From Swiss-Prot, chain A:
Binds 2 magnesium or manganese ions per subunit. Its EC number is 3.1.3.16. It comes from the Eukaryota. Belongs to the PP2C family. It holds the Pfam family PP2C. The 'lock' site stabilizes the complex made of PP2C, ABA and PYR/PYL/RCAR receptor by keeping receptor 'gate' and 'latch' loops in closed positions. This is Protein phosphatase 2C 37. GO terms for cellular component: cytosol; nucleus.
Swiss-Prot record, chain B:
The record marks 185 as: Involved in ABA binding. Upon interaction with ABA, the 'latch' and 'gate' loops change in conformation leading to a tight dimerization and the creation a surface that enables the receptor to dock into and inhibit the PP2C active site. It comes from the Eukaryota. This is Abscisic acid receptor PYL5. It is found in: Cytoplasm; Nucleus; Cell membrane. A motif (Gate loop) lies at residues 113-117. A motif (Latch loop) lies at residues 143-145. Residues 51-201 are annotated as: START-like. Disulfide bonds: none annotated. Belongs to the PYR/PYL/RCAR abscisic acid intracellular receptor family.
Length: 399, 203
């Protein structure tokens, strides 16, 4: 782990001993990375439904100007560039921490080398109470063609899931999540009609490039990896090639399987639907789309479907964290490495009492993973969510 | 496995699609292929969709019916400088030579994310405002369609609508079959023409 850390931090402290267990040391090393500006915003976020503890928002602005992408060279010129963070439209990075006793989360989402930011992240702690238990919602959406389907998932999917879970008979998670994703897909497909009637919502109009081009773009879609975390279970629903990985006692356990067109069962499904997979710069549905399931992408239905695969995992005392990320991370960082990095950050913070430290640790983990992906020349947007799953020592809260 | 090239759409008159398979007319290394054979089209349309296909090349065409007069459709199709008005896969386009109204003018298009292409440099080959014919060829870019050339013609249908015929010829890239190449390009062209129909009707 120290090796990875050194690799990222590069040559700033070649002789300095790496103390991978100290959060302070890690924070210091992160601070040394150039072009990072940490803005501590004292504004208090609106209180969450069931969580009225002190909240603090921390925004990390990461420059991803092309010239700044090579972390090693950044580090070499650190003295000149340090703290002179540059923000441009191509480099909006946000890492948010929600400081409260439940739950502890870190997220980072960067444009990276791409021209457009088409990833979206959705974090809704305590989005739902069921049987007097708190449920949390986390989602990563990686758009293609344009950003508006991923944006729509960010805006709507947690509400759709909430409504579906509220009418869920028993623990029919699979059916409920499949229904939710199908509803999401329908909303995306029908969005055009709403647009004509009501006009686009402001946020859409501002953020969506293709809006001006054609309201009815069939050729836009998004992956969706969503996790609902309850005190007892982790429910992961996945559609596309984003991924959820559980770090349990140091072991990386994937909770989703990427929907790639050359996955044998997906290949058969596509062929049975009358489609075909063509190797055209990688395996693609009809030679076009490099994933076999997605929200949206009407023009590739029924070969590309919005149905998620759902896993339900019982939580254990050995669970450390959950990582949700877009393929901008997973293309260049293996599951095991990602778990190792996150674990190191969390261990540095220690479990339990110091809630701020644990939050910082999750943010550190998300940020460090993102930096690692950029250092490894990830060519895509990179979005990472790290959720601390360790049970409190004092057992005050169960999630 | 059914190939989308032989598209069941081909015989499905309700959605207005016909994907035509090339018909060999001569033997030898270069084959002359008329892609509108069997259709009732004006002579100049048939002529424009006749291609000389070399070895390791392939050609195909997609037909789209639009319930609007040719003039309305032409207003969108003629925009060599702004293909985004109906082509969903284009993120950005700029004219890099000329004004987009003359043969030889060049445009550079950037492709949206998620496709096996980044950019394409294209040359205007035909712009016939009277007969409603536009043609461009690909002269560069970051994608696998080498020596691509397409021709799009509009003519009035019997029911006062428009028949759009778009045909293309392209090299079969190394590592792929002719069938795969046709399947891929047909998907893109079909999507564009469906979008053209929607965009025209929205005008």
């Amino acid at each position: 782990m120290a090796g990875i850390c050194c690799g990222v931090v590069g040559e700033t402290e070649p002789a300095a001993p790496v103390d991978s267990t100290s959060r302070a040391s890690l924070r210091r090393r992160l601070d040394l990375l150039p072009s990072i500006k940490i803005v501590a915003d004292s504004a208090v976020a609106p209180p969450l439904e069931n969580c009225r503890k002190r909240q603090k928002r921390e925004t990390v602005v990461l420059s991803t100007l092309p010239g700044n992408l090579d972390l090693d060279s950044n580090v070499r010129s650190e003295n000149k560039k340090a703290r002179s963070a540059v923000t441009n439209s191509n480099s909006v990075t946000e890492a948010e921490s929600f400081f409260s006793d439940v739950p502890k989360i870190g997220t980072t989402s960067v444009c990276g080398r791409r021209r457009d930011m088409e990833d979206a992240v959705s974090i809704h702690p305590s989005f739902l109470q069921r049987n007097s238990e708190n449920h949390h919602f986390y989602g990563v959406f990686d758009g293609h063609g344009c950003s508006h389907v991923a944006e729509k998932c960010r805006e709507r999917l947690h509400d759709i899931v909430k409504k579906e879970v509220e009418v869920m008979a028993s623990d029919e998670w699979t059916e409920t999540m499949v229904k939710s994703f199908q509803k999401m897909d329908k909303e995306v497909s029908q969005r055009e009609c709403n647009l004509v009637v009501n006009g686009a919502t402001r946020s859409m109009k501002n953020s969506c490039r293709c809006e001006l081009q054609s309201p009815q773009c069939d050729a836009v879609g998004s992956t969706a990896v969503v996790s609902v975390v309850t005190p007892e279970k982790i429910i992961v629903s996945n559609c596309g090639d984003s991924r959820a990985v559980l770090c349990r006692n140091g072991v990386a356990i994937p909770l989703s399987v990427d929907h790639k067109p050359d996955r044998p069962d997906e290949l058969i499904r596509i062929q049975q639907a009358g489609g075909r997979v063509i190797y055209w710069d990688g395996a693609r549905v009809l030679g076009v789309l490099a994933m076999s399931r997605a929200i949206g992408d009407n023009y590739l239905k029924p070969y590309v479907i919005p149905d998620p695969e759902v896993t339900v995992t019982d939580r254990t005392d050995e669970d450390e964290c959950l990582i949700l990320a877009s393929d901008g991370l997973w293309d260049v960082v293996p599951n095991e490495t990602a778990c190792g990095v996150a674990r190191m950050c969390l261990r540095g913070a220690g479990a339990g009492d110091d809630s701020d430290a644990a939050h910082n640790a999750c943010s550190d983990a998300a940020l460090l993973l993102t930096k690692l992906a950029l250092a490894r020349q990830s060519s895509d947007n990179v979005s990472v969510v790290v959720v601390d799953l360790r049970k409190r020592r004092n057992n005050q809260a169960s999630s | 496995m059914r190939s989308p090239v032989q598209l069941q759409h081909g015989s499905d008159a309700t959605n207005g699609f016909h994907t035509l398979q090339p018909h060999d007319q001569t033997d030898g290394p270069i084959k002359r292929v008329c892609l509108t054979r069997g259709m009732h089209v004006p002579e100049h349309v048939a002529m424009h969709h006749t291609h000389d296909v070399g070895p390791d090349q392939c050609c195909s065409s997609v037909v789209q019916m639009i319930h609007a007069p040719p003039e309305s459709v032409w207003a969108l199709v003629r925009r060599f400088d702004n293909p985004k008005v109906y082509k969903n896969f284009i993120r950005q386009c700029r004219i890099v030579q000329g004004d987009g109204l003359h043969v030889g003018d060049l445009r550079e298009v950037m492709v949206v994310s998620g496709l096996p292409a980044v950019s394409s440099t294209e040359r205007l080959e035909i712009l016939d405002e009277e007969r409603h014919v536009i043609s461009f060829s690909v002269v560069g870019g970051d994608h696998r369609l080498k020596n691509y050339r397409s021709v799009t013609t509009l003519h009035a249908s019997d029911d006062e609508g428009t028949v759009v015929v778009e045909s293309y010829i392209v090299d079969v890239p190394p590592g792929n079959t002719e069938e795969e190449t046709l399947s891929f390009v047909d998907t893109i062209v079909r999507c564009n023409l469906q979008s053209l129909a929607r965009s025209t009707n929205r005008q």
